[in-house]
């Protein structure tokens, strides 16, 4: 029997409000997870509205069965980085009224030791979002060069002791390969020089490996760039990020498309022509969870919501 793991959607009300739901609109939940945001969107859609969900986790696809009887809902098994292609396959480019992304690992993924995401629960060192394909964390750690590991830990985990930890992993794996999350977490805790308060020494390395194994930042970049091309005029984009790497990407993306393309000085272009290169405008300021939400769900603490709107020129 499959064990169920609870998931509380972060910034639920604020994220869906950011979409400015039209009852007859077409919306995309780019990170279905366990369906919390999708459920709220469906509550606000009318009988002719439509919601398309995307997720690459087979367990999320199974969870979507809860909406099997709702004709307004459909789900695609795949990565959100291919969002624009899925929209084109459906013939809906330029007709999407809103897209939401909730980046990061869901509570069910973290809480299920068999998925291998958590350094607090012993399980196979997997970390794949889609555990039906691709290289596992254990397989990568077994073959990666010290320089490659150090680069991943530094770039994706912002780990200050990246090279030292990479050397220690390489030395230990020559004796016994790392196959379990606890083995890796214990090694990092033993050799790490980190003194961050209230943060496990393995936090940054586990984050880095997960991001690398799943090509998360590349997927996010593709998803955001694809989203802006498929939105209808006045279509909304609600994006939740969970760590500084993600949030910087989202912030820069919105800023870049809000400013438009830089035009060489002296070109005979009108202001209206220059404005046509501006594709988005930011809606309000970044939103963080309330103290009450953090009390209910400690994992919401680091989340940030940013909302943007597709311009119509």
Curated annotation (Swiss-Prot):
Q: Which GO terms describe its cellular component?
A: cytoplasm
Q: Quote the Gene3D superfamilies the UniProt record gives.
A: Putative methyltransferase TM0872, insert domain, Vaccinia Virus protein VP39
Q: Which biological process terms from the Gene Ontology are attached to this UniProt entry?
A: rRNA base methylation
- Its chief place of residence is cytoplasm
UniProt KW Chloroplast keyword: no
Top-rank lineage group of the source organism: Bacteria
> Which enzyme type, at the first EC level?
transferase
**EC numbers for this chain:** 2.1.1.199
**Catalytic activity reported:** cytidine(1402) in 16S rRNA + S-adenosyl-L-methionine = N(4)-methylcytidine(1402) in 16S rRNA + S-adenosyl-L-homocysteine + H(+)
Carries keyword Transferase?
yes
Q: Which UniProt keywords apply?
A: Cytoplasm, Methyltransferase, rRNA processing, S-adenosyl-L-methionine, Transferase
**Family assignment?**
Belongs to the methyltransferase superfamily. RsmH family.
Entry function: Specifically methylates the N4 position of cytidine in position 1402 (C1402) of 16S rRNA.
The protein's name in its UniProt record:
Ribosomal RNA small subunit methyltransferase H
- What is the species of this protein? Shewanella loihica (strain ATCC BAA-1088 / PV-4)
